Amino acid sequence: MIGIYLLIAAVTLLYVYLKWTFSYWDRKGFPSTGVSIPFGALESVTKGKRSFGMAIYDMYKSTKEPVIGLYLTLRPALLVRDAQLAHDVLVKDFASFHDRGVYVDEKNDPMSASLFQMEGASWRALRNKLTPSFTSGKLKAMFETSDSVGDKLVDSIRKQLPANGAKELELKKLMATYAIDIIATTIFGLDVDSFADPNNEFQIISKKVNRNNIEDIIRGTSSFLYPGLEKFFVKIGWKQEATERMRELSNRTVDLREQNNIVRKDLLQLLLQLRNQGKINTDDNIWSAESTKNGVKSMSKDLIAGQLFLFYVAGYETTASTTSFTLYELTQNPEVMEKAKEDVRSAIEKHGGKLTYDAISDMKYLEACILETARKYPALPLLNRICTKDYPVPDSKLVIQKGTPIIISLIGMHRDEEYFPDPLAYKPERYLENGKDYTQAAYLPFGEGPRMCIGARMGKVNVKIAIAKVLSNFDLEIRKEKCEIEFGVYGIPLMPKSGVPVRLSLKK
């Protein structure tokens, strides 16, 4: 009998707790949506029907409110729908939203102290130190290495095509291979050929990052929504295989370079400068990384590994998706494809018939195509911040309290006709001099403000190389009927459900 009473009491307490939790936004005076106990806005994610980003997109489309309360399982969060308010959160009022609110533990887990995760003064100090890594001069110095990976991409495609006629290739997988190699060479300085060796160390790490099994789902959810839980997992020694493999690879490479005085023009070399000299040299011609006289290291090997892992994971998925989605859209828009091909041809011709960094920089129409792809298919479909001090919402009586997670649906804003006329149409002209028929505050594929993606310029260069190589060496078959890409239901990045099919043939 006592057991029954205890059970009734437990159920009653649970009911009261859930009702109290899921009435949070009502008590704060905010409009709300996605009030589905116990998973809130993520109910479709738990049922395997939608990815995290697309579930938030559904919430975005369900209302016209400028800011709306929702529930990420048991955690209340705010979805910002108004473009100007989103811009203020990221830029003008950055002081009130300067952190992401995700898991980071610099002291006990240095691998977590990546530029993406770090907070406050630690983040600002590291950001300032890393900024010189991505200047035009540094990227130009790395270009020859990147270009050689583009040649391997061309060779791989050639081998798969018949001597006559076209063949359908799945571009997402192909461009993922290209992305892995270009990241491995420009970041780690390692000569990797995943086209010839699909089981190399970087490919293995990539597969472990993208497993989408129950372990990864739990760890990803805890890192994003419940940082305290992730700290507990780390404390009890629950290691993530991909992270550990990256740590080992990074440490081996650092030791090899420092012990043998090896100098290469890549991102790791710049991090070694920072480790050994306390700063990255702003002279684009100096790449050496000798230690200072006192031998003090300003950056641990684990901290270096954390940055490399971030740049690897972020750069790999963004490059692969943006490249494949752009080529897919070109096959659906023949006029756009002809302009892009001419842009590539004329830029290469202008620079002596070679694909150089300067030629890439001159491809303005191709740049506009990439910007339009990043709008329609943002690699990360959402941005997140956390309120770091109480913030009165402009033109309202609402106050966002410190500690509140903030979500901005990029795919929501980017496909909102209020901000982008005819949002599903692929129009690179939006970004050319006579375009600009869109709300600029709503265009956020690389983020905005002080925490804007630090590697955006490098990413665009890598995407341009791949597209320029493909357009210069192959013919792409125009699709007879336009077809929108369906997205997968796992992970946060925007992933195609069934790949990105494009028919190619050898250039006549």
UniProtKB/Swiss-Prot annotation:
Its main location: endoplasmic reticulum. GO terms for cellular component: endoplasmic reticulum membrane. Its cofactor is heme. CDD domains: CYP6-like. It comes from the Eukaryota. Belongs to the cytochrome P450 family. Keywords: Endoplasmic reticulum, Heme, Iron, Membrane, Metal-binding, Microsome, Monooxygenase, Oxidoreductase. Heme binds at residue 453. SUPFAM superfamilies: Cytochrome P450 (SSF48264). Its EC number is 1.14.-.-. The keyword Oxidoreductase applies. It holds the Pfam family p450. May be involved in the metabolism of insect hormones and in the breakdown of synthetic insecticides. It is a peripheral membrane protein. It is found in: Endoplasmic reticulum membrane; Microsome membrane. GO terms for molecular function: heme binding; iron ion binding; monooxygenase activity; oxidoreductase activity, acting on paired donors, with incorporation or reduction of molecular oxygen. This is Probable cytochrome P450 6d5.
